[in-house]
Amino acid sequence: MPLFGMKSSTSQKDLQKSNTSDLSLQGKASSELALDGWHTIALEYSVDWPLQLFFTPDVLSKYRKVFQYLIRLKRTQMELEKSWTAVMHQDHVDFSDYCKDRKNSSATQLRRLRTKPFWRVREHMAFLIRNLQFYIQVDVIESQWNVLQTHVQDSHDFTELVTFHQDYLSALISQSFLDIGSVSRILDSIMKLCLQFCWSIEQYETGANMFEIDHITEEFNKKSNSLYTILRSSRLAGSQRAPFLRQFLMRLNFNSFFETTARGVMNSGRLRPGTASTQL
């Protein structure tokens, strides 16, 4: 019987959320920081004979690659949602305190005013991650799975079946841009920046530097603009490697926000925290 499993060389106890403080000291892109052990989580699949002829090491490696990408994408989405829930709860508490004692609640009001721009940035991040996740799971995986099922039903021998399955995996890799170094590095940086933003917000009340959050915001907007610029390039948009790329770009740029910022109209691609929400 084939066995499924997950393994990680780093436990969750080893999470190092304090790495966000390095931003103000090093000024490096977040893609250079190893935030925690989530990137080491891998899918393991033990195959018995004769399925080893079908699930070769190369096939399992491709499944692992897609799995790691999906789990990191989902984890980023969950962190963004969790941060919103936590701060909305605190905001309701602050508002309640303000209503009870308006004369002595200036500090509470000041905190609410300071944190509002952060959640505009968070919504910008969540917007990109949600659309990317939808594209990968629906436009890529689900559509290619339907194609594979059709081909399997029409296959006549084992060789054809192997070929169709290889085509399926290759399509997942290519249409998810995992085989394009420039795109995969940007996606990796975007997810790390989202996590750093969430963790910085959690530490805000305990002394997180405003410069850190501003730096993360600036880097995120640079990376997201770069991603949009690359994906809409003629090399990708005009090819057949990503047939649903146009729909993905349309969802991202439904109000011309990405197109405007990618052209450098807004101060060389830098967005202020209050800008994203008005556009999104």
Residue ranges, per PLM feature:
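Extended, charged interaction scaffolds in large complex subunits
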Residues: 1-280
